């Protein structure tokens, strides 16, 4: 897992900062009808930040269910296997967007 690209946009009126970029995840195998959270380092994220992710593609049966800040500089992406068999997902590039408000902006 690695951050490939990173950019920042500032909103001086509302005091928000938006960071964006890409990262890759090579998820562990998921059993049928289960979900798991993959974590990765994303420098600068903090508790209270909003995280949005969008995979550029996914292995059939996998669903990117959501993302969150799990700790300082760390995000978690929850993947769900919707199939009745296990799935070993391929490495996938994700686009991300982090919104920071107030003092962190």
Show the residue positions of the predicted features.
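Extracellular receptor-binding modules and their adjoining Ser/Thr/Gly/Asp/Asn-rich linkers
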Residues: 1-45, 72-75, 80-105
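Low-complexity "stalk/linker" and mucin-like segments enriched in Ser/Thr/Pro/Ala/Gly
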Residues: 60-70
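Short acidic, gly/pro-rich beta-turn/loop elements at beta-sheet edges
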Residues: 50, 63, 87
């Amino acid at each position: 897992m690695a951050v490939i690209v990173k950019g920042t946009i500032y909103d001086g009126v509302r005091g928000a900062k938006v960071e964006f970029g890409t990262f890759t995840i090579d998820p562990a195998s998921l059993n049928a009808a289960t979900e798991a959270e993959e974590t990765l380092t994303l420098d600068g994220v903090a508790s209270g930040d909003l995280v949005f992710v969008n995979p550029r593609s996914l292995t059939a049966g996998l669903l990117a269910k959501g993302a969150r800040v799990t700790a300082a500089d760390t995000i978690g992406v929850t993947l769900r296997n919707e199939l009745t068999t296990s799935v070993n997902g391929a490495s996938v590039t994700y686009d991300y967007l982090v919104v920071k408000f107030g003092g962190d902006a």
